[in-house]
């Protein structure tokens, strides 16, 4: 199944916007697995089995596996997810970004070796660094846009000078912020296949609303809820298709009379709200899987409840 239809099906079946991030740290595993990297698959598979009916997606972070020479366990884990929860897409969080020939190899890694359903990418090197991934029909690509870390502002919140004669509201127009430029490109000329999405941190709800206004039909992967401090209600209100935060479409360089014409009524893209540590390490005891399920269930319900205005 193609990534976006699969995502929408999981959202409907599980009534969920929650994505569980799989970031295994052996030092935090329960006894007797604590410190044993050979148990990465066992730990993550137990989390998957306990939460599969609570999520819209799973998101393994490749560095947490590669650091422990556990890439083979990552392969097994993704295969396990596809077996026990075939309706739930797997987003491989790798944030790849390189020139075309190297990107081709990263695409083989993600979609042939690991058989992920979607992949996170850095758009910094431009469209030709993304094209090789588009050769894989049905696979989703989620581009970094406004990330949850404080240092993201060093680049993503910088204003573009742009050509003085650029049409207002077009990508690269003077006064546009870099993250806005990325959102416009992803929603417009780069999205030829209809399989792009954007990554926007839960720690910046105003920016989520802005990105949603610029990209009303794209899926938004929103990390940062839970241990990173993102607020579930603010996140949903800003990004959900029925939310209240994406109504104006006004850029930071526009007046109140100049808008993009994109409103919440046109918003169809799902949101994928990711939580990792709060779920994975809800308990350090033998009940870690049931504790993870309890946290995932509570988070899912909080996200669903946040859809209601008021």
What are these regions (language model features)?
Residues 1-60, 65-87, 166, 287-288, ...:
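Conserved N-terminal beta1-alpha1 strand-loop-helix module at the mouth
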Residues 11-13, 48-54, 78-85, 132-137, ...:
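Acidic (Asp/Glu)-rich catalytic clusters
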Residues 20, 58, 93, 119, ...:
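Conserved, mostly hydrophobic/aromatic
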Residues 26, 31, 98-199, 217:
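Conserved anion-binding
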Residues 67-83, 99-103, 123-138, 202-212, ...:
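Active-site-adjacent beta->alpha loops and helix N-cap segments on the catalytic face
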Residues 202-245, 265-273:
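A C-terminal functional module that forms or caps the active site or interfaces directly
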Residues 235-242, 266, 270, 281-310:
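C-terminal helical cap(s) of enzyme catalytic domains, especially alpha/beta-barrels
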Residues 246-266:
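Long, intrinsically disordered low-complexity tandem-repeat segments
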């Amino acid at each position: 199944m193609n990534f976006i239809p699969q995502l929408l099906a999981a959202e409907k079946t599980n009534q969920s916007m929650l994505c569980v991030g799989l970031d295994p740290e052996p030092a935090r595993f329960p006894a007797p697995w604590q410190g044993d990297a050979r148990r990465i698959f066992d730990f993550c598979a137990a989390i998957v089995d306990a939460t599969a009916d609570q999520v819209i997606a799973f998101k393994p972070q490749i560095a947490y596996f590669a650091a422990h020479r556990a890439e083979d366990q990552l392969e097994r884990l993704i295969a396990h997810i596809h077996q026990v929860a075939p309706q739930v897409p797997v987003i491989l969080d790798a944030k790849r970004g390189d020139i075309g020939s190297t990107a081709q190899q990263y695409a083989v890694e993600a979609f042939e070796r690991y058989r992920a359903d979607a992949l996170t990418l850095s758009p910094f090197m431009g469209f030709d660094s993304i094209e090789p991934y588009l050769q894989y029909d049905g696979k989703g690509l989620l581009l970094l846009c406004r990330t949850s870390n404080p240092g993201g502002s060093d680049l993503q919140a910088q204003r573009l000078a742009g050509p003085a004669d650029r049409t207002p509201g077009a990508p690269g127009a003077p006064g546009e912020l870099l993250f806005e430029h990325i959102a416009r490109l992803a929603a417009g000329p780069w999205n030829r296949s209809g399989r792009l999405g954007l990554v926007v941190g839960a720690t910046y709800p105003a920016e989520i609303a802005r990105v949603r206004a610029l990209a009303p039909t794209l899926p938004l992967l929103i990390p940062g809820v839970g241990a990173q401090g993102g607020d579930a209600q603010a996140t949903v209100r800003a990004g959900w298709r029925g939310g209240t935060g994406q109504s104006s479409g006004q850029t930071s360089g526009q007046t109140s009379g100049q808008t993009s014409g994109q409103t919440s009524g046109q918003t169809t893209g799902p949101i994928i709200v990711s939580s990792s540590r709060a779920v994975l390490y809800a308990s350090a005891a033998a009940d870690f899987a049931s504790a993870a399920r309890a946290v995932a269930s509570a988070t899912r319900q909080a996200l669903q409840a946040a859809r209601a205005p008021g």
